[in-house]
Every structure is written in structure tokens, then in C-alpha cells.
Amino acid sequence: MKLSRKAKRYDDSVLPGEFQGFEVFHRVDAELEGTLEGFLRRSQDGVQLGEVVLERHAPKKLSFAKLKNKAEALSEQVNYLKERLEIVDHDRRGMYIQLRSLPPYKDDTQIQFNEISIGKNKIVVKRIAFYRKEEVKQQVPLQLSERELERLLFDIRQAIA
């Protein structure tokens, strides 16, 4: 997925999370001609999702208008996370759209938000925390129920199909 310069600088400034104990998963999706991969940890409280990446290996012709429509539809569909998603960045030439939680979760020490990056053939889902005192952005787990995880995987698959 080709990122805009602004998005690339932003992604480079997000530190990787501490995901020891998370299980890595990798699934081939023959119908979609792609792969689903990421890492998560299951517990009695549900699922902690580190990151999920759905990539289509067979390139699909897609205009930016269609990509934007898919992003808008995804932001409406994914209404079961704690914060609603809105488009915050896009790059027409690079065929890239970024959705983020608005308003994000805030407390005295941090700001947290969900982020879904949508490219022509790839979708990345993660949660990011900005720690105010250290002024550091770091990836953190996204807390979901099993049902929310299955629905999220279904919704992102529909967006890239």
C-alpha cells in the first residue's frame, strides 16, 4: 500500500506495541485471492487484537471514488467499536484512505484511537495510543469480543472484495 508522505511520516512515528504472548495467525483466502494475518490474544474477557492485515494478491481495478465509497461504507458498518470511525486522511494518487476514531478515547495520561488504513488491495486495522507525558505514539491492543472480531473480519473482507 503506497502511503502519502504525511501518512508515511506518521506511520514511522508510531512505535510497535508490546505484544508478547500474542498468537500469530495467517489464513489464505482462496475466494478473495488473498491472505489474512495478524496477532491476537484470547482470554475470558474476549480478544485483544494486536493488528490485522487483509491483503488481496490479485490486483483489482479500482478508482479513487470507489475506494472512498468503500471506506465510507466501512465507517458506517463498523459501528460496534467503542468509537465511531471517520475518514481523516487520503491520497488520490497512492489510492490510500485512513479511517480513525473520532472522538478518540482520552484520559489524563493518554489518547487512544482505532485506525483502519485502506489501500487498493490492502486493509490494516490497529489501535494506537498517544502518551501525553512522553509524547510517544505506540500501538496497543484493541479489546474486542469474539463476536466483534468475527464481524470486523467479515466487514473488512467485504470492503476489499
Regions found by a protein language model. Give the residues of each.
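Short, structured motif recognition centered on aromatic/hydrophobic residues
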Residues: 35-40, 111-125, 152-153
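The feature represents the first ordered module of a protein
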Residues: 48-115
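Residue-level detector of solvent-exposed, low-hydrophobicity positions
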Residues: 10, 17, 71, 103-106, ...
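Charge-rich, low-complexity N-terminal segments
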Residues: 1-78
